[in-house]
C-alpha cells in the first residue's frame, strides 16, 4: 500500500498470450503472472491507481524516476502548458532526466529558471537536467504524447 510497482495479474481469465507473438508472450507472461507494463499503487481504501508505464520509467543512478510525476509538477509552473519527460542515455547515471516543454502563449521562462524552479518542487535525483522548448510535441490522433519519438 502506497508503494509504486508493476501491476501483475494472475487468474484463469487472463490471456494465454499474444497472437503469433511468442517473444512478446514470454516477456509478458512469467510463471503464470501477466506483467501489465503499468506502474500503480493502492491507496488506503484499497483502490488501485495506475500512475505510469514501466517502459517510461527512468532509472537514474539507481533511483526510479516516474516521468508522469515530474510532468504533473512541471505543468503547475505558470509559464508551462505541457511537459513530456523522458530518460536519455548518460554515462555517469545510466539515464538522465530530460523534459520537453510547450509554453503557454505569451509566457517566457529560460531552461535554467525552470530547472531551478523544479529543484524546489522535487527530490534532487528527479528534476530535469535538460529542458528543450518546443512549439508542439509528437502526438497520436487521440492526443497521447509519442515519447518514443522524443527519446
Segment roles from a protein language model:
Residues 1, 17-20:
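Active-site glycine/GP-rich loop and adjacent strand/helix microenvironment
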Residues 6, 11-12, 16-17, 24-27, ...:
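AMP-binding/adenylate-forming catalytic core of the ANL superfamily
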Residues 32:
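FAD-site-proximal beta/loop scaffold in flavoenzymes
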Residues 131-134:
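General small-molecule cofactor/ligand-binding pocket signal
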